[in-house]
């Protein structure tokens, strides 16, 4: 994870290398999907996104950016990352608060996989660094939030994602029209819930869809 002290959205690229600053997106435009969940349809051919549930952090005419919620980062452990980043000494790991000990690390997407993004509840905010996304949900991409979590002074709910999913202008809209994604409102239980394996099924049930009956239907709910 690359150390960063600046706010989210600076020095980012779409998957196709086009520039996008999420801090400049039209967050409150009703035509966009900020704060919504994307649920991959069976026709999704890209294995990186098969059966994925993605929280859309930013969406505008300039493109979209989101965090995959149900792809654990394998052997990557949050406490080990704190040690690697010199936020805490290994000998002090025993002193970590429960919120840090249980912090989930996700594969947030295929773009900038060496950079960390913390999706969290809105009870924590850093001026000029935290991006409010939707009611109760924010995104912060600086080391300051990791330091706060390690001290027990961070947000009540949070997940750390390595990398993100990015779409060029109009790309996400096209994928939805091609039945690649369903989208629906998000809730904190789905975003921060610890039952990672069941998030895909739970997201579908949230909008009344039986996964066994899912086919190439319309891409919204």
UniProtKB/Swiss-Prot annotation:
Any single GO CC term annotated in Swiss-Prot or TrEMBL for this entry: cytosol
Superkingdom: Bacteria
Assigned protein family: Belongs to the UPF0301 (AlgH) family.
Database matches in PANTHER family: UNCHARACTERIZED PROTEIN YQGE, UPF0301 PROTEIN YQGE
Name this polypeptide is given: UPF0301 protein Nwi_2752
Species assigned in the record: Nitrobacter winogradskyi (strain ATCC 25391 / DSM 10237 / CIP 104748 / NCIMB 11846 / Nb-255)
